[in-house]
């Protein structure tokens, strides 16, 4: 629409917006963040390594790099992110008694590096903790509807296809 709105307004009105998602991958494992219990959506659930809205005037890769730095303290460069593709999503739900309409186009990236989670600097307002999990175990949990995860199966399949055989650690 060309309209600049807040994150809250985008989700209350279902306005189409851009996001940047970064999956941190090390062999057959992916890094998941446990969202802060104070988040306005999906509180306390396991999620993508790093993700966020693209601010007005920002580009996709710059937003992905910003979110990595803000949420996890990772200073990456654009050549370290590998573009996996775009993912369109719409979710209609409710959190804290308020409608939540997530209407997004996500730019999905892979960051294939060994990350020492003990050295990460977590943005506690966003991220409670991080864990490494086996890619295929996460995929199995998501496919079975495990409510501990707020991850879309089709995005995991994008990442599986993108990294190919590198995910069987």
Predicted regions and their residues:
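Short, well-ordered strand-loop elements centered on a beta-strand within folded domains, enriched
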Residues: 1-4, 29-34, 118-122
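Short gly/pro-enriched beta-turn/loop segments at secondary-structure junctions
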Residues: 17, 78-79, 102-104
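A glycine-rich, hydrophobic loop/mini-helix early in the fold
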Residues: 19-51
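Short, catalytically relevant binding-site loops at active-site mouths
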Residues: 37-39, 54-55, 89-91
């Amino acid at each position: 629409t060309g309209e600049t709105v807040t994150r809250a307004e985008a989700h209350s009105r279902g306005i189409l917006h851009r996001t940047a998602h970064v999956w941190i991958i090390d062999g057959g494992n992916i890094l998941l963040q446990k969202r802060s219990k104070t988040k306005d959506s999906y509180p306390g659930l396991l999620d993508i390594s790093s993700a966020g809205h693209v601010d007005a005037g920002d580009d996709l890769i710059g937003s992905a790099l910003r979110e990595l730095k803000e949420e996890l303290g990772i200073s990456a460069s654009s050549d370290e992110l590998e573009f996996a593709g775009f993912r369109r999503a719409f979710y209609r739900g409710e959190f804290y008694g308020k409608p939540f309409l997530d209407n997004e186009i996500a730019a999905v990236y892979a960051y294939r590096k060994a990350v020492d989670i003990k050295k990460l600097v977590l943005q506690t307002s966003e991220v409670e903790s991080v864990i490494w999990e086996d890619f295929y175990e996460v995929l199995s949990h998501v496919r079975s509807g495990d409510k501990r995860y707020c991850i879309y199966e089709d995005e995991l399949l994008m990442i599986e296809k993108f990294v190919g055989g590198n995910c069987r650690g």
